[in-house]
Design a protein with these regions (language model features):
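C-terminal structural segments of small proteins and small subunits
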Residues: 49-77
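Flexible, active-site-adjacent loop/turn segments at secondary-structure boundaries
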Residues: 2-5, 42, 49, 58
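Aromatic side chains
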Residues: 15, 21, 33-34, 65, ...
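A short, structured beta-strand/loop element
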Residues: 22-54
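Short amphipathic alpha-helical patches
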Residues: 11, 36-40, 57, 68-71
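N-terminal first-folded block
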Residues: 1-27
Length: 77
């Protein structure tokens, strides 16, 4: 299992948008994205710090992705 890198919220937003997630609304400092066909939601905090690993894994789980899918996206594969 490959190690999950530290990433910023902007990178996870780009990953979600690449996979057809659409910005639904913002609540405070969080962006709420949804997928039109799977109806899955992902809540992304908006700040300029790296996302904690637990938050990142929770976000991937609620959006229906695996750690390896994100790592492949970040490495450009």
């Amino acid at each position: 299992m490959r190690k999950l890198p530290a990433i910023k919220p902007r990178q996870i937003i780009r990953f979600l948008e690449q996979h057809d997630f659409i910005l639904d609304h913002t609540t405070g400092s969080h962006y709420v994205y949804y997928h039109p066909t799977s109806r899955r939601r992902a809540v992304v905090p908006q700040h300029n710090r790296d996302l904690p690993k637990g938050t990142l894994m929770s976000l991937l789980r609620e959006a229906g992705f695996t750690r390896n899918e994100l790592i492949d996206f970040l490495s450009g594969s």
